[in-house]
Amino acid sequence: MKRLSLLIFGLILSTTVPVMAADCPALVKQALASTDALCNETGQNQACYGNINLTARTNASVENFRFSQPGDRTDISNIKSLQLSPMALDRGEWGVALMKVQANSPTSKPADLTLLAFGDVTLENDVPSPTTMDVQVVGQKAINIRSLPNMKAGVVGSLKPNQTVSAFERVSDGSWLRVKLPTSDQMGWVSTDYMSGAGDIRTLNIVDGIQPHYQPMQAFTFKSGSEKQTCAEVPQDGLIIQTPEGSGEVQLWINQVVVKLGSTVYFQAQPSGDMVVTTVEGHATVEARGVSYTAVAGSSIHVKLDADMNPISAPSLPQAYQMVDVANLPIAHLPRKISIHMPLAQTEINTLQQTQPANTTTNSNNNNNGSGNNKPKCPGNSCHNGTNNNNGNGDVDKKDKDKDKHKHKNG
């Protein structure tokens, strides 16, 4: 009888476990707590597997890739795409991933963006595998590092005679190289008239020289599920991005839309639907098709997307969000503690918008930062990989450079 009682108790226990697992709030709480515990040592430019299930696709050159169970970490440059599982109560699944991405900020202070993705989310890295080579200053004079690849651009640093730096990218004719400043993570441009290297600069990625340098997961395609959660306590599938304290404004390229934020922002996006940029703290400026608007805390902006997640409209005017849409966001699991801003009144949003600078821009149109026939195929800095430049044999064209060679100390 005793053995029979134990058997019955075991059967009862085994049937109650799935019921417990099917409790939505409990599953969310467990998934986020697991992510906190397993991912607390995630380093700069790393992704961490927080909770099941995640499926990662790697870049072709990556070997010995491991990112298959909670707690696994990898460099974000290894990841081509990342797909998270929607909530599946019967299997106890609700995908969570944490990423620490170096902030694309004009400040030289090293800082990390926090990206927390949850639920039915897919992220695809739009930055190609990085290329680099060492180059050295030629001659006995110091040379200038410039903000843009031309002799009239502002000076952001300098190099000493014979100093060696890392070059990451080049313009299409090979006349300028984008290099990392020796004293910071900031990037700048040097003329190849004054540099030499043992490698072939044609192996460097080709860029337009106007857009900022995007590192892995600073430019990505993102989509989230559209199904409403059946549990009121569960946040809708999406992505939260938080900037670090004191980093200033950070620029990202999301679904070919420029987003500049200094804040905590919640993103959702569906094919042939909208990308919704919801600012729960701070501000976010959204730019597409030559138009930009700023959503302050308590408001959101919509951008219409096509089936391939490309923008097909300018951003909407900011509008108040519904508190029910943000109340359950997992902000307690972000490094910088905040409170979700109450929705602003639409009249207040309109007043704030009137005090902002003109919202039309020339940067987007000139750089094909839109869609349709002028749609870019890359996030500004990565239009071509290596020698795939349609530039004949790839020889450096210097026919116009010698005019300034003796007039400037590198400009």
Regions found by a protein language model. Give the residues of each.
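Short, polar/charged, low-complexity connector loops/linkers at domain or secondary-structure junctions
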Residues: T285-N350
